[in-house]
Amino acid sequence: MTENRIILHCGFIKSASTSLQYELVKSNKNFIGFDPSCKNDKFYSDDELANFFEQVVRFADCSIYNKSYKKIQKRLDQILLQSENDMIISNENLLGKIYPFDLPNRIKIQRFTSVLPNNSVILIIIRDLKELFYSWYKNLVSIGYSENYLYFINEIKIMDKYMSYFDSFNLQKIIHEIKNYRPDLKIEICSIDNKKNFNKILKRNRLPCIKSIKNKGLQFSNYQDSLELNKNKIRGLRFLDWIDIHRIFTNLKINENIKYQHSRLRRHHAKEIQKQHLIHSFSEDKLNFFNNLPKKIEKISMINKVIYDKQV
């Protein structure tokens, strides 16, 4: 009889996470969350685990973590003991310094590995970092960011200078930290840039395959139109003061009016852009975005690819 395990999917952002989460919702696995469909008006089926993985791991001070982690250990053991299948937790924000107020990887890794049983699996999904940052920028624009890509790139350069932002996506350093705290844990790495092996790795870990592993992202006719809309609706929203309120501060589904006010609903943008009947191409903007990214990002991306290729 195969022993049930906890599989923790913990990164990267903008790397087919939502596609995987939707497949997990449909599967027979004991999927705790994050559930993008927000079934029963909740992103997680367990409030204690939601609070720990969404808030305590990423943002809380040491006193809050020290009070909670043993309770979470017992809770995970309890759920796993009662489960007929593997237990899956998916939160792509656990790796990488997504926002300025995210704790460093070292602390987040220490926290989330400290509560996992011995036979647990860490699943990391990677992609080319230039594509990741471009997709992340478009995502921010879709929910209210009001500056062009050059301003955004300057902001992440500032974050890198003071917070080692780019290295928070360095797979070599991430694996080192995981092994430092929990050498017993199994680490599996998928890449959405390698379609051939992506589902093979999921399958060998008893996870559902993804029909399309392309990161869907939001397709606006032109991001300039979205920026103009943002500037008219919200004045001066920038990355360094950005708060993604619906993920950080609650496990409950927020009232639509509050989301509209604070997070800039995606579908609202889509409707507004459609009204403008503008047809443009992202290709030129994307090339300019890539050309202005620091070379360090490409170097880290190459390191990640080498590590992934060795595993495969």
Q: Whereabouts are the PLM-identified features?
A:
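Anion-recognition interface
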Residues: T2-V312
